[in-house]
Amino acid sequence: MTPNKEDYLKCIYEIGMDIPKITNKEIAARMQVSPPAVTEMIKRMQSENLILKDKKKGYLLTNIGLTLVSELYRKHRLIEVFLVHHLDYTSDQIHEEAEVLEHTVSDFFVERLESMLGFPKTCPHGGTIPAKGEFLVEINNLPLSETKEAGTYLLTRVHDSFDLLKYLEKHAINIGDKLQVQQFDDFSNIFTLIHNNEELLVSLEIAKQLYVEKMN
């Protein structure tokens, strides 16, 4: 399978995690390609039983497609663990490197890498690393945006976008840190948080990319 086709599969999976309907237009926007290019790739993937079309939800991954996506995430996240723990990469440096390597390393290499790393369960961003042959199921999946209730929350996972990671680095926010939600303003869509005795005003868009666990 080509790296381009693998990227399309991951894109469809990620869109499905964010919005209820996966359209040609949304795929084109995220892949930064033309709608006709998406249409052509969609036809190929449908012929290979990687995706199917649903009237309500748009394009969906088949079990074959989901198996391939899960393996891509497994490779990607194991590589990220290796880069951080053995090559001293920072969390905002690893995503792009892993994006390249995930398409080139062999299954044998990944199995040896996983064993060497001690079979980690999560990547440096808190994302689940599925076992070989298993579907990806995120264990840390409660967005901060859905926790409007005041209280203390444990940061368990973050999206691996460069801008978000630089924002978190600026405020020294790391996986495993405690975030105290003071209030949520419905008008401005702003969360007021306390982190390490510092008050932070966090937008709803950022809160959607932070995953937490209620502590009290």
Q: Which functions belong to the PLM regions below?
A:
Residues 36, 92:
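Key DNA-contact positions within bacterial/archaeal DNA-binding proteins
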Residues 26-29:
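A short alpha-helical element within helix-turn-helix/winged-helix DNA-binding domains
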Residues 46-54:
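A short, conserved structural fragment
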Residues 57-76:
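Basic, amphipathic "hinge/linker" alpha-helix immediately C-terminal to the N-terminal HTH DNA-binding motif
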Residues 42-43:
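Short, hydrophobic-biased segments on the C-terminal half of alpha helices
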